[in-house]
């Protein structure tokens, strides 16, 4: 059984999707801890309602980013996860902290990477005239939103889309994509044990398309 720790900064809608999917008999994973940089994050309340370890590790005034990350990951290590999932975690993790992690960490991003890393992805997709938009799951590395891509889900951009409407449509994709990716890791279909992700025993050359 894959032990998953989740990092989240906000309301926790993707955490809720992960929790719901984890209850399936063949899920292959369970969430063992939820951690946030925000003391009032809705994700923490969701975790506590589900009797899952939950903790806020907030950044202290003038605390270096690497020091905050070290405290965070020391707390995460207490639940002994095999995988860390960033599901709406809004802080950039320091390269120093990442270099000391002994387990893989993945992130859900609301664009079809490598397009539109960073923030405001929905408005940027519309401004660019993109025909498609969606979400991606990738391995977290020191480069922002640039780690190896694992899976994507895409939708067509419609003529009447606004950033808000597009965000809502992509969020529905996120709620399917993230649990599907974690299930694939739990079942060994996606292997993150080496420097290059593998799928079905061969190096993953392109992200899985999980529409």
Give names to the regions the model predicted.
Residues 36-37, 60-61, 65, 69, ...:
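N-terminal glycine-rich "phosphate-gripper" loop used for MgATP/nucleotide binding
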Residues 21, 29, 83, 87-200:
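Donor/substrate-binding cores of folate-linked one-carbon enzymes
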Residues 8, 65, 69, 167-171, ...:
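Amphipathic, non-transmembrane alpha-helical scaffold segments
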């Amino acid at each position: 059984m894959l032990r998953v720790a989740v990092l989240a900064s906000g309301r926790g809608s993707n955490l809720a999707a992960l929790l719901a999917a984890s209850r399936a008999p063949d899920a292959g994973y369970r969430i063992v801890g939820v951690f946030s940089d925000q003391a009032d994050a809705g994700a923490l309340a969701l975790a506590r309602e589900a009797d899952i370890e939950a903790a806020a590790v907030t950044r202290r005034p003038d605390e270096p980013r690497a020091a905050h990350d070290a405290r965070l990951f020391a707390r995460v290590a207490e639940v002994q996860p095999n995988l860390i999932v960033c599901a709406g975690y809004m802080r950039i993790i320091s390269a120093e902290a990442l270099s000391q992690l002994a387990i893989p960490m993945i992130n859900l991003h609301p664009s079809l990477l490598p397009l539109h890393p960073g923030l405001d992805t929905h408005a940027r997709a519309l401004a660019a005239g993109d025909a498609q938009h969606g979400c991606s799951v990738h391995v977290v590395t020191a480069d922002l939103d640039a780690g190896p891509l694992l899976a994507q889900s895409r939708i067509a951009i419609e003529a009447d889309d606004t950033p808000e409407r597009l965000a809502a449509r992509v969020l529905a994709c996120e709620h399917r994509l993230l649990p599907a990716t974690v299930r694939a890791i739990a079942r060994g279909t996606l292997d993150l044990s080496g420097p290059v992700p593998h799928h079905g025993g061969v190096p993953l050359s392109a992200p899985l398309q999980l529409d």
